[in-house]
Amino acid sequence: MRGAGYHTLNLERRSKSDSMTESRRLVYQTLNNENPVRVPRHVWDIQWTYEHFPQEIKKLREEYPDDIVWCPRFLKSDSGCEGDPYAVGTYVDEWGCVFENKFEGIIGEVKQAQITSEEWEETEQIAVPKAFLDLDVEAINEYCKQAGQFVLAGSSVRIFERIQFLAGTEKTLMDLYMDPDSMQPAIQKVHKFFCEELKAWAQTDVDALFIQDDWGTQISLLISPELWREIFKPLYREYAEIARTYKKKIFMHSDGYILDIIPDLIEIGIDALNSQIFCMGLEKLEQFRGKITFWGEIDRQQVLPFGDSEEVEQAVKSVKEHLWKDGGCIAQCDFGVGVNPYNVFKVFETWGKLV
């Protein structure tokens, strides 16, 4: 299987003690369906978590430490970002997109689009964040060496969402259906940059590259599967090929109902997928068991905020029943706004009893 030999090689190259390599070994065994001794853990938290539940998150980290971590975005020059993306107010990201946030703990919406004309060809309006290509490789590699866990790249690749941030969601979706060819200059400029960014991260000691795009509503894709395959699948294929070229794994996140494109993600070589598996239905996802690793989750809309102990336990058992096959599941769980902290503990307690 892809990555098995690289796993052993990288453990030796990073020269960690046996105790420091256990987390990485677990994740690779899970990705390769090699029957790990337990399920790898990954908690997703935000600043809100530490402000509202400091003792709970501290205890959780002590009792159920992560096996997967994000590498900080070590850059040699300033990113150009201004403000806090999760705080109330205005935030300017690395592309110069201005976000207005009215609620603490979640990223806001783009306030003003950069591509305001009817001509997508005017790509000079798109200023790519070149600072994101000038990685501090020494700092990244040192982080990977000291971390002990499976390390994900701090990459910012989100081709569909970035086009929306630059042009606005309404214009993006309308033109995808009415005149998709006109969008190609902008899409290709952003895509070329993202390929360069992934290649930069792939030449560090991180274990996996990371890409993300929210493709679904709660009941369907935002665009037709056919249109997705025509325009975006080739781009994701190239991202996955970069990972293979540099012998890295590749992880992807996408919210919403994306069942229709999961076979495509498997085909192009996505190793692990974080998605809203409960809105798609575990029974429907069972057909993909053993073909891709389900990187979480547990229902963060109903079960984590409102469920009782038995409901949380049953949710975890259902994931194990339908999606586990000698691996292929990561115990990922959100500890964000509105989540009951006791339910997060119950998630990992239950996984610990099952695997």
Predicted feature residues:
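A contiguous, low-structure linker/loop signature
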Residues: C81-P129, Q146-F150
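Active-site loop segments of alpha/beta catalytic cores
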Residues: R2-E51, E56, V92, N101, ...
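An N-terminal domain-start capping segment
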Residues: Y64-P72, K111-I126, S155-L166
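Segments that shape or occlude catalytic/ligand-binding pockets
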Residues: T49-D84
